[in-house]
Amino acid sequence: MKRTYQPKKRQRKKEHGFRKRMKTKAGRNILRNRRRKGRKTLSA
């Protein structure tokens, strides 16, 4: 059986990237919360 995580740089950026987060209200909320918490990386 193969593992579930098969990393791909492009796919990761497309799904969890900054621009994708900025597109939706919910995504902007995620970024806002991560900024408030002081996360070093906001998104993939």
From Swiss-Prot:
One of its GO terms (molecular function) is structural constituent of ribosome. Residues 1-44 are annotated as: Disordered. GO terms for cellular component: ribonucleoprotein complex; ribosome. GO terms for biological process: translation. It comes from the Bacteria. It holds the Pfam family Ribosomal_L34. Keywords: Ribonucleoprotein, Ribosomal protein. Belongs to the bacterial ribosomal protein bL34 family. HAMAP family: Ribosomal_bL34. This is Large ribosomal subunit protein bL34. It comes from Natranaerobius thermophilus (strain ATCC BAA-1301 / DSM 18059 / JW/NM-WN-LF).
